[in-house]
Amino acid sequence: MDVLSRVFDNEKEELDPLLNNPLTASEFRAKKAELEAELESIRNGTCKTLLDLADELRRSRDEELEIAERWRTFLVNRAQEEYEVEMKAAKEEYEYRCKTLKEMVLSHLNEKKRKIYEAKDMFDIGSESSTLLLHDASSQFIDRRKLRHRRNAGNQQNTQQLPSLNFFDDYLLFPTDETAVIPQSVKNAVRNSVNSVKPTSAEASLFSPLLSMANANPTNGRERDPRASERAERDREKAVEKGLSGATEEDIQSDLQLLKKELAKKK
């Protein structure tokens, strides 16, 4: 064993065992020569003990570098996995927000579309109402009660019962399935009867079928059969619901002229 090896082996001992035994002159010279040779090998880098120590240190270094490299690889992989997880979560959140925003925009547009359609429907209803009002010509034409007070209504005469204006409005101005087949000559006779004080015998004979429908058991000039009145009112309401916009300009002018005549008679 060389001196360097003994130094490493006995570095923890308090005293060198060689110091316990005194050396002779020959042993000292031999020991000195051994140390000088060992120092020379250390300088030249050929000392076995030094080379073994360097190899051991090199192996320890390589092991530590390998451990450090593995730890670095583990951290890189862990960071990559966390990055992918966070990117996936961020992408899902982005898609969810885009979908929510799209639904909100579509809902807002549908609401605006619904309001526009409602406004259009209200405008159409208003236009139809304006058309009905133009056809009615006046509120007196709609309110039948204002036209029921006829001249000489209280005069109890045994003459042929004349038709009331309500009957004329209900069965001629607003024709039904039953009155649609009435000939035009009969309608003209009814108009003349309304405008005259007393009907002629021919007009009375033409008007008698209509009179039996409206006034089965008359007691005075203003009383009518309730069933005929109800039916006339229903027919009038159906005609109004269907809309009066289908009337021609000739019908409107004729109705206005008739209304003016009735008002002139009352005056």
Swiss-Prot record:
Q: Name one Pfam family in it.
A: Sds3
- What subcellular compartments does it reside in? Nucleus
Region of interest: Disordered = 208-252
Grouped into one coarse class, the protein's main location is: nucleus
Sorted alphabetically, which keywords does the UniProt record give? Chromatin regulator, Nucleus, Repressor, Transcription, Transcription regulation
| One GO term (biological process) | transcription initiation-coupled chromatin remodeling
Subunit architecture: Component of the clr6 histone deacetylase complex I composed of at least clr6, png2, prw1, pst1 and sds3.
Protein name (record)? Transcriptional regulatory protein sds3
Q: Source taxonomy lineage? A: Eukaryota, Fungi, Dikarya, Ascomycota, Taphrinomycotina
Q: Point out the gene that encodes the protein.
A: sds3
